[in-house]
């Protein structure tokens, strides 16, 4: 059976897991880290994803893209997008009403949609899983914030398609965290659980009941634009103002200085979760000025005071929606790295009259953990008793309906309705002999459609002439388990039907765009592999040259070398090392040719010393890091270790 993975696609970090042999495995990346930064960097020579991208962000701030999750499925004019752009060092432009990142890549200006950036991160997570599992992975469950709307969910699903994944399901992050909590709990009777999920960029609260493997979400609330990054922003603003006050210089327009300050602020924020005080020390932050300051937990809580207060509002709303008393919540489960902040934990505890939240699950990994379990269930893995007994019932986060006369929102599916669900309602015409109706689909909680999000619209034409109120038009909303919706309308008199194909009017990618992005993704992957091959060839040549140099200077070898051979070999090695220094961007073929050239000089000399029994001592390492690519130097002697 093909393996299916669970991916927590986070704003700041992503995580991947697999459920097999009755246990969850969170898979570490090539750096040994169990979470991978959601960063993609573009340079003159290559594309970097994850740790390598984040590590170089200070020297390449304009071409390192992060926070794609804060842009995905949104419109360029959204207030949140406009606010975020003030903090982004990279350029965000408008294309067809959508935010698109613009970078310099290999000397060209390139535009990437948030879906494409997210797909690159998903590809990285997929490759991490594949190298661990030793095979191809196609199936995945991807998580999204519970409060993501239809277009954000669809855009995330599109990102999965561009990454070449078969997305089995889009599931809500707090629900996934609930699975992580409830999987091993064998309690009797029903348990009321509140999931408090505060990540790097989003915040969700979900209330659910768990009973004998049935996870039923009762209500959900949240803020798709509140997380650890917002606390970082507050610290950055605070300390850039302090720098200005102390040194009379404004660093707010210098992307590199701001990035270095942000990295220091993020580190300080993490330290303050376990210490009451920390210091920030940045050498030559701006115009040669060193910046040294201290930060206390009290000051951090002060600069983010309103954000902390805002944390509790969705919790109150969730309980209010389901008419639940605080005292009947049996367990509070924390998910997302930002729940490590002591102030957040204290607010949660105080809100529940001193009840301590459960800390038995790792908040960074809980969401990927639950997604991996759901992936195993959806891929048909029945090998485990735990997965066989689990049933997940989630809810619609926002009310869904159509616009009726006077711009009124008439909801067909109310928020917190269990999904999947299908609802139909009959409407009629507003004026006599009306030939058609415009069905406009909205999502949101306000009474007037002008205040909420238009998802899409379509026309039902060909209605027979009749007085107003006579034609019967049945509108059906079909909301699937991913939280993605199809809408159809039927005019009962004529049997005319039409259904919505929500396209670019709500930011969806067309089939052609997805196919183009898939082709681009494949092209970038090939380029990445070619660059890796080029670097491997360069490392192989460098390694071979220095290995020869060490061999020549070995006293045991030196005494066997004639002066002429030594001079020839040393000259060839020095020439090669100088050539490498001058040709850092040479092609793989050029490095291989240079290696062959060096081998043609070195091999005859080495043969004289060692005869036919061995190769150059300590010569090129075997295939691996620093080794030449296959085919390089095939005509030389075999390489063996020689004492």
UniProtKB/Swiss-Prot annotation:
It comes from the Eukaryota. Transmembrane segments: none annotated. Signal peptide: none annotated. The keyword Chaperone applies. Gene3D superfamilies: 1.20.1270.10, 3.30.30.30, 3.30.420.40, Actin, Chain A, domain 4, Substrate Binding Domain Of DNAk, Chain A, domain 1. PROSITE patterns: HSP70_1, HSP70_3. One of its GO terms (molecular function) is ATP binding. Keywords: Allergen, ATP-binding, Chaperone, Nucleotide-binding, Stress response. InterPro entries: ATPase_NBD (IPR043129), Heat_shock_70_CS (IPR018181), HSP70_C_sf (IPR029048), HSP70_peptide-bd_sf (IPR029047), Hsp_70_fam (IPR013126). Residues 612-643 are annotated as: Disordered. Residues 612-625 have a biased composition (Gly residues). Pfam families: HSP70. Belongs to the heat shock protein 70 family. This is Heat shock 70 kDa protein. It comes from Davidiella tassiana (Mycosphaerella tassiana). The gene is HSP70.
């Amino acid at each position: 059976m093909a393996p299916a993975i669970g991916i927590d696609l986070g704003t700041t970090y992503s995580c991947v897991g697999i459920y097999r042999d009755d246990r969850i495995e969170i898979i570490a990346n090539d750096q040994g880290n169990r979470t991978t930064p959601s960063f993609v960097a573009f340079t003159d020579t290559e594309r970097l994803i994850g740790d390598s991208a984040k590590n170089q962000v200070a020297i390449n701030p304009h071409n390192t893209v992060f926070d794609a999750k804060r842009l995905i499925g949104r419109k360029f004019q959204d207030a949140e997008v406009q606010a975020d752009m003030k903090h982004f060092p990279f350029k965000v432009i408008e294309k067809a009403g959508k935010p698109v990142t613009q970078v310099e890549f290999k000397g060209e200006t390139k535009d990437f949609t948030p879906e494409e950036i997210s797909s690159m991160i998903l590809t990285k997570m997929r490759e991490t899983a594949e190298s661990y599992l030793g095979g191809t992975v196609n199936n995945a469950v991807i998580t999204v914030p519970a409060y993501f709307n239809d277009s954000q969910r669809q855009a995330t699903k599109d990102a999965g398609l561009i990454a070449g994944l078969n997305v089995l399901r889009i599931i809500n992050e707090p629900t996934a965290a609930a699975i992580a909590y409830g999987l091993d709990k064998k309690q009797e009777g029903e348990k009321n659980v509140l999931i408090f999920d505060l990540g790097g960029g989003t915040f969700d609260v979900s209330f659910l009941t768990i009973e004998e493997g049935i996870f039923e979400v009762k209500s959900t609330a949240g803020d798709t634009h509140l997380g650890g990054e917002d606390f970082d922003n507050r610290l950055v603003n605070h300390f850039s103002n302090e720098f200005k006050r102390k040194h009379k210089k404004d660093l707010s327009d210098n992307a590199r200085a701001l990035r270095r300050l942000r990295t220091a602020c993020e580190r300080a924020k993490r330290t303050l979760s376990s210490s009451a005080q920390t210091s920030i020390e940045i050498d030559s932050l701006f115009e040669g000025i060193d910046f040294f300051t201290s930060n206390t937990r009290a000051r951090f809580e002060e600069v983010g005071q309103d954000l902390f207060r805002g944390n509790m509002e969705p919790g109150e709303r969730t309980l209010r929606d389901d008419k639940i008393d605080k005292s009947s919540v049996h367990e509070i489960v924390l998910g997302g790295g930002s729940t490590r902040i002591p102030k957040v934990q204290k607010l949660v505890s105080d809100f529940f009259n001193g009840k301590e939240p459960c800390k038995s699950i790792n908040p960074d990994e809980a969401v990927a953990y639950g997604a991996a379990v759901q992936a195993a269930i959806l891929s048909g893995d029945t090998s485990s008793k735990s997965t066989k007994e689990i049933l997940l019932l989630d809810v619609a986060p926002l009310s869904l309906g159509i616009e009726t006369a006077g711009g009124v929102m008439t909801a067909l599916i109310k928020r917190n309705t269990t999904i999947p669900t299908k609802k139909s309602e009959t409407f009629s015409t507003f004026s006599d002999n009306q030939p058609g109706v415009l069905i406009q689909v909205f999502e949101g909680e306000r009474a007037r459609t002008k205040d909420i999000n238009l998802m899409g619209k379509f026309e039902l034409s060909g209605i027979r002439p009749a007085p107003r109120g006579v034609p019967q038009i049945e509108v059906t909303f079909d909301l699937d388990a991913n939280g993605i919706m199809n809408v159809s309308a039927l005019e009962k008199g004529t049997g005319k039907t039409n259904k919505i194909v929500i396209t670019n009017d709500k930011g969806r990618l067309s089939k052609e765009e997805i196919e183009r992005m898939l082709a681009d993704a494949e092209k970038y992957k090939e380029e990445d592999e070619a660059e890796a091959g080029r670097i491997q060839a360069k490392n192989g040549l460098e390694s071979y040259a220095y290995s020869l140099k060490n061999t020549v200077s070995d006293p045991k070898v030196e005494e066997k070398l004639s002066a002429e051979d030594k001079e020839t070999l040393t000259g060839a090695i020095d020439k090669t090392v100088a050539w490498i220094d001058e040709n850092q961007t040479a092609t793989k073929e050029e490095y291989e040719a240079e290696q062959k050239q060096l081998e043609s000089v070195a091999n005859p000399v080495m043969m004289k010393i060692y005869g036919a029994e061995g190769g150059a001592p300590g010569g090129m390492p075997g295939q691996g890091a620093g080794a030449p690519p296959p085919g390089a130097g095939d005509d030389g002697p075999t390489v063996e270790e020689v004492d």
